[in-house]
Amino acid sequence: NFATMAMRAVGIPVVVQTTTWTKMDLAHSWCAVLQDGEFYDFSPAYAGPDEYRQKLMTVRYLKPAKVYRNLFDADFKKSRTDDGYTTYLKSPLLKDVTAESGYPVLDLRIEADKEPSSAESLVYLCAYNYYEWKPVAIGIQTDAVCEFKDVVGNNIFIIAEGGKEQELRYITAPFLVDSSGHIRKFIPDKNKLVTQELWIEKGKTPRNLHFWDVEKEYFIPVSCDSITSDTTQFYTRIPDNALLWYATSHRAL
């Protein structure tokens, strides 16, 4: 923000763009400069426009699912029936610029697995980020069909409704949407178990395998059957077609 204000103070048309990561924790912000009617991404600390845009578009875990621009002039034309749920995505100082940023986007359309609270409502596209599902986009649900505009594929999401209680109510199972828009839902088959051998990083905090239980709506630990060496863990009781999460059980303090 300091670099942005310093450049704007001398007349350089710079803005801040931001994303919530979908393949790792937390969020990220960078700058974009206006030149001949187009914005070019760059990082004041790391790289210039060409190099930085290329990095965001080609490094798998850095490719944003949604990109937003922080505005200096509030856009009060945004109007939608509010459900009372609080999220920064509703700010009039935020603009969705995913499509204009050059990423391959798609319009996501998916049917809810659980009955929504009303025939039409706002819905939230969420990514799992730092031990919780966090909204990354707002869409609309009509007759149990959820729609979101300009989403980057090859990401895992879940869809939820919000409310004045500030809690999310999940109305789909977690799912993967690929770059073509094909959807695979992760609904565990507890009657069909699969095995998996996982690598243990030396010197790192021990991690545990979990799967998302669509009925309980949280990640359930999977028991480790054996540690085959000082570098591997062996699991034999993993529900088939489950969304797996391999991580420490608690947030860092």
Regions found by a protein language model. Give the residues of each.
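A short, amphipathic beta-strand motif
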Residues: 104-116, 195-198
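Beta-strand-rich domain onsets/edges
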Residues: 79-106
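Hydrophobic/aromatic-rich core segments of domains that either
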Residues: 1-82
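Short, ordered, surface-exposed loop/turn motifs in non-cytosolic proteins
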Residues: 115-132, 202-218, 222
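Short, acidic Ser/Thr/Gly-rich low-complexity loop/linker segments typical of extracellular
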Residues: 130-145, 227-229
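Structured interaction patches on ligand/partner-binding surfaces of diverse proteins
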Residues: 163-191, 252-253
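Short Pro-Gly-centered beta-turn/loop motif in secreted/extracellular proteins
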Residues: 36, 144-166, 234-251
